[in-house]
C-alpha cells in the first residue's frame, strides 16, 4: 500500500493529488503494482504543495487532477513548477479537449491523460517520464560500488590474465591533399607495376600501412573507370544529337552530293560498238545499191543512202556518159552499133574513206581496173559485143 507521509528510498517516488479518494487509491495501487513506484496520495492540493516545498527534490512524478474545488489544477501546476522547475507533472481530466491540453503543456505539464486511469494508461506512463531520472538512479548505483576495493582488485587481475580481451583502438586515415599528391606521384612512377608495398616505399610516409594504401588504390581505379564510362557516354550522346540536328533538306543535300561523287557508268564503249555496227550495215547497203546500178544500167544516187546530215555534196554515179570532161569514151562506137561500152564515173569533191572502201570492194569483186584522177575515178568495165556473143 502507498504511504501518505514520507518517501521511502530505493525506488522512484510519485505523488497523486485528487479530491476523489477512490480514484486516488486505485491509481496509487496500479502505480505500485505495474511500475513499482513508491506512491504518496493527497486529497488536498494545498497540503501537497506544502509537502513539495520540503521534499521537492525527492519526488520524481506528480499526477494531479485538473478540476479540484480547493485549488484549480492549473494553479497547482504553476506553483509546483515554481517550487521545483525540473519536477515532472502529468495532469488528469475527464475532459481531454485541445484547449485543456494546450494550456497544460504551456504551463509545463508533460502530458494530459483521461480520467479515470486504467491499467493500460498506467503501463504507458513511462513514455512521458523523462529518462534522465532513470539514468541518474543508475549513476547513483554505480557510484556506490566504486569504493569496494576487492571488486576493483578482482577486475584488475582478470584483465592482466586475459590481455586478448583488451580491444585495439581503430583509427581512420584522412587522405589530405599532400598525401594524395604523393600517392599520384608514386602511381606515375610505377605505372603498371603499382602495388601497395611499392607505393608505400615511394611515398615515404610512416603513419600509413599497406592495407590503407590498397583500399585507396582500389577506390582510385574505380573512380577512373567510372570517369571513362561517363566520358564515352557523353561523346556518344553528342554524336547522336549532331546527327539528329540534320534536317530533311540537309540530308537530301548530303545524299545528292554523295550521289554526285559516285563514278558514272561508262556507256561510251556500247555506243561506239553500236555506231560501228550501223556503219557496217550502211556500207553493205551502199555496196549492194551500186552493184545493182551497174548491172541494170541505171543512175546511182548516193544521197538516198547517205547517213551524213551535215549537207555534204552527194556522190554521183553516171553510167554510159561524160561527167564534166573528166572521162571520155574509151572506144568509139561503130556505125552498126554492135559494139557497146559501159563506163562508170564516180565523182566526189571530198575523198572520204567510206567511198574509197566501197570502190575497192567493187574492184576486187568484179575484176575492174581502176584509174584514179584528181577529181574523179574512171573504171573500165567489161565490153560486150555481138560478135563475141555469136
Curated annotation (Swiss-Prot):
Chain positions found as 4-aspartylphosphate: 65
Main location (coarse class): nucleus
Residue spans binding DNA: 169-226
Post-translational modification: Two-component system major event consists of a His-to-Asp phosphorelay between a sensor histidine kinase (HK) and a response regulator (RR). In plants, the His-to-Asp phosphorelay involves an additional intermediate named Histidine-containing phosphotransfer protein (HPt). This multistep phosphorelay consists of a His-Asp-His-Asp sequential transfer of a phosphate group between first a His and an Asp of the HK protein, followed by the transfer to a conserved His of the HPt protein and finally the transfer to an Asp in the receiver domain of the RR protein.
Alphabetical list of Gene3D superfamilies matching this protein: 3.40.50.2300, Homeodomain-like
Domain Response regulatory per the UniProt entry, residue ranges: 13-130
GO cellular component: nucleus
MF GO annotations: DNA binding
Keywords: Activator, Cytokinin signaling pathway, DNA-binding, Nucleus, Phosphoprotein, Transcription, Transcription regulation, Two-component regulatory system
PROSITE patterns found in the cross-reference section: RESPONSE_REGULATORY
GO biological process, one term: phosphorelay signal transduction system
Domain of life the protein comes from: Eukaryota
Disordered: annotated segments: 233-271, 303-339
Biased composition (Polar residues): 257-271
Subcellular location per the Swiss-Prot or TrEMBL entry: Nucleus
The family this protein is said to belong to: Belongs to the ARR family. Type-B subfamily.
Role: Transcriptional activator that binds specific DNA sequence. Functions as a response regulator involved in His-to-Asp phosphorelay signal transduction system. Phosphorylation of the Asp residue in the receiver domain activates the ability of the protein to promote the transcription of target genes. May directly activate some type-A response regulators in response to cytokinins.
Official protein name in the record: Two-component response regulator ORR29
Organism (species): Oryza sativa subsp. indica
Amino acid at each position: 500500500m502507498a504511504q501518505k507521509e514520507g518517501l521511502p528510498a530505493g525506488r522512484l517516488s510519485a505523488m497523486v493529488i485528487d479530491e476523489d479518494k477512490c480514484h486516488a487509491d486505485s491509481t496509487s495501487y496500479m502505480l505500485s503494482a505495474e511500475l513499482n513506484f513508491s506512491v504518496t496520495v493527497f486529497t488536498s492540493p494545498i497540503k501537497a504543495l506544502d509537502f513539495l516545498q520540503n521534499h521537492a527534490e525527492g519526488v520524481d512524478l506528480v499526477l494531479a487532477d485538473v478540476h479540484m474545488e480547493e485549488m484549480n489544477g492549473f494553479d497547482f501546476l504553476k506553483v509546483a513548477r515554481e517550487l521545483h522547475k525540473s519536477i515532472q507533472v502529468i495532469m488528469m481530466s475527464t475532459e481531454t479537449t485541445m484547449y485543456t491540453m494546450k494550456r497544460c503543456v504551456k504551463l509545463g505539464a508533460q502530458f494530459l491523460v483521461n480520467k479515470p486511469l486504467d491499467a493500460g494508461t498506467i503501463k504507458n506512463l513511462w513514455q512521458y517520464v523523462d529518462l534522465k531520472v532513470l539514468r541518474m538512479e543508475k549513476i547513483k548505483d554505480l557510484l556506490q560500488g566504486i569504493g569496494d576495493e576487492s571488486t576493483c582488485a578482482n577486475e584488475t587481475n582478470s584483465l592482466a590474465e586475459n590481455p586478448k580481451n583488451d580491444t585495439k583502438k581503430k583509427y581512420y586515415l584522412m587522405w589530405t591533399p599532400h598525401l594524395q599528391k604523393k600517392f599520384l606521384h608514386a602511381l606515375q612512377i610505377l605505372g603498371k607495376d603499382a602495388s601497395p608495398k611499392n607505393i608505400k616505399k615511394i611515398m615515404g610516409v610512416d603513419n600509413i600501412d599497406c592495407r590503407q594504401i590498397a583500399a585507396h588504390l582500389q577506390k582510385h581505379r574505380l573512380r577512373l573507370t567510372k570517369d571513362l564510362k561517363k566520358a564515352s557516354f557523353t561523346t556518344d550522346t553528342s554524336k547522336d544529337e549532331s546527327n539528329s540536328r540534320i534536317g530533311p533538306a540537309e540530308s537530301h543535300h548530303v545524299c545528292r552530293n554523295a550521289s554526285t561523287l559516285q563514278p558514272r557508268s561508262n556507256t561510251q564503249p556500247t555506243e561506239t560498238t553500236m555506231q560501228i555496227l550501223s556503219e557496217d550495215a550502211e556500207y553493205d547497203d551502199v555496196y549492194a545499191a551500186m552493184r545493182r546500178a551497174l548491172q541494170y544500167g541505171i543512175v546511182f544516187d548516193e544521197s538516198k543512202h547517205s547517213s551524213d546530215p551535215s549537207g555534204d555534196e552527194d556522190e554521183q554515179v553516171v553510167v554510159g556518159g561524160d561527167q564534166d570532161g573528166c572521162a571520155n569514151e574509151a572506144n568509139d562506137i561503130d556505125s552498126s552499133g554492135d559494139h557497146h561500152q559501159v563506163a562508170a564515173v564516180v565523182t566526189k569533191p571530198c575523198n572520204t574513206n567510206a567511198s574509197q572502201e566501197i570502190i575497192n570492194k567493187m574492184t576486187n569483186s568484179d575484176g575492174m581496173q581502176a584509174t584514179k584522177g584528181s577529181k574523179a575515178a574512171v573504171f573500165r568495165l567489161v565490153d560486150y559485143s555481138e560478135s563475141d556473143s555469136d
